[in-house]
Amino acid sequence: MATVIPGDLSEVRDTQKVPSGKRKRGETKPRKNFPCQLCDKAFNSVEKLKVHSYSHTGERPYKCIQQDCTKAFVSKYKLQRHMATHSPEKTHKCNYCEKMFHRKDHLKNHLHTHDPNKETFKCEECGKNYNTKLGFKRHLALHAATSGDLTCKVCLQTFESTGVLLEHLKSHAGKSSGGVKEKKHQCEHCDRRFYTRKDVRRHMVVHTGRKDFLCQYCAQRFGRKDHLTRHMKKSHNQELLKVKTEPVDFLDPFTCNVSVPIKDELLPVMSLPSSELLSKPFTNTLQLNLYNTPFQSMQSSGSAHQMITTLPLGMTCPIDMDTVHPSHHLSFKYPFSSTSYAISIPEKEQPLKGEIESYLMELQGGVPSSSQDSQASSSSKLGLDPQIGSLDDGAGDLSLSKSSISISDPLNTPALDFSQLFNFIPLNGPPYNPLSVGSLGMSYSQEEAHSSVSQLPPQTQDLQDPANTIGLGSLHSLSAAFTSSLSTSTTLPRFHQAFQ
């Protein structure tokens, strides 16, 4: 059996004790058994002594791995704390002003500005406010130094320079001269000394002339970040407030269900060239449909009509009538009738050629027979006069819109060849609806209508322009095909002359 010496029992018990997280009141702090050989400081661990030794050698083994960052640190903890500044996420938020910070100590220093018990000191000469009395007295001393007065405003002592006066003001701020830090970091290019290495690096821009901080509003450059921040608050305060108030997701100008006048909706579209309109990707609520009617009639079972605003190039955005403001409702000059041809909106990602084909298939399916054509033509002759009279009233309102002309001109290029798409257009189209013309309106008189009904040409040749593959020439032939097929029906007289 093993024997245990009573004298060693206490040592065994001490080694078996589980170390507690908190020290008791009677216990003293751990001894600093690791003194520095170069100074009088001592530390309680080898790691802290090693970190301290870097202050004597100038070594900084922990370097930042970012490409444009040249900072290095004496400990791994300080490097990790610095790496948070390269992250776009700021996790520490102020509860008073919602300002975000990368580090917790920066937030803690910022919270002192929101202390309600702290009085502010306002300068009567320039109106600036200061949170600390020391900063306020320094500011007053600067005003006195600029005027040539180097006397202390508290004890009326005179000094030889402004720097000595500012050092003296610290004694009146409740700080003893012994507690003042030593400026042990000296600049390599001048005699100035600073408290920290950070202040030295910030001062170096005076000698290097580097200006790495660019203002995003006026392209002015600065050597220090605090100078850029001061410039932004002073010169671009309105821009900063505008950025804070804007939402994250900007509204698309073509977003539907917005009660905006149609004229206002057309402005952002009309300001764009046609090449940008063709290359711009459309949202799911905006379809490219060259043959959409401006108004889509619903079923007659009491359902409300859905208004479709006709944009240039046939871009349509359905707007519910309930969501439109009463002041924005359109006054329809021509009522809905059986000639309102309802066209189904194509799928979201259907190409342009597929849209035209599906539309033409619907036209072929909805065209009446030849016998019904003759009956429709005879009945349309009877009701032609009142229709012409109603159109004559709006002759001044209906004209070729400038928007359609300005958009069709850039499309007259050889690159946009849609001639193959129009080869299979049927000769028999739906009856003419004055509302389906959209923005392409024409004006004519009543006397011209009777003469043109009886003397319509069978077909008109295309405009022989090699550069204009599509444009007014193809639209001219397309309109002639419809007018020749409908003969004396309710088509608009001299429809082809509007595109000559």
From Swiss-Prot:
Tissue specificity statement from the Swiss-Prot or TrEMBL entry: Expressed in fetal tissues such as lung, liver and kidney. Not detected or weak detection in normal adult tissues, but highly expressed in salivary gland with benign or malignant pleiomorphic adenomas with or without 8q12 aberrations, with preferential occurrence in benign tumors.
Region (Massively activates transcription): 385-500
SUPFAM superfamilies, sorted: beta-beta-alpha zinc fingers
Glycyl lysine isopeptide (Lys-Gly) (interchain with G-Cter in SUMO), cross-linked positions: 244, 263
Location in or out of the cell: Nucleus
PTM statement from Swiss-Prot or TrEMBL: Sumoylated with SUMO1; which inhibits transcriptional activity, but does not affect nuclear localization. Blockers of sumoylation pathway such as SENP3 and inactive UBE2I increases transcriptional capacity. Sumoylation is increased in the presence of PIAS1.
One Gene Ontology biological process: positive regulation of gene expression
Mutation effect (residue 244 to R): Abolishes single and double sumoylation; nuclear localization conserved. Increases transcriptional activity and inhibits repression domain activity
Compositional bias per record (Low complexity), positions renumbered to this chain: 369-380
Other remarks in the entry: Residual nuclear import after mutation of the nuclear localization signal is assigned to zinc finger domains of PLAG1.
Family note: Belongs to the krueppel C2H2-type zinc-finger protein family.
Disease the record associates with this protein: Silver-Russell syndrome 4: A form of Silver-Russell syndrome, a clinically heterogeneous condition characterized by severe intrauterine growth retardation, poor postnatal growth, craniofacial features such as a triangular shaped face and a broad forehead, body asymmetry, and a variety of minor malformations. The phenotypic expression changes during childhood and adolescence, with the facial features and asymmetry usually becoming more subtle with age. SRS4 inheritance is autosomal dominant.
Protein name: Zinc finger protein PLAG1
Species this protein is from: Homo sapiens (Human)
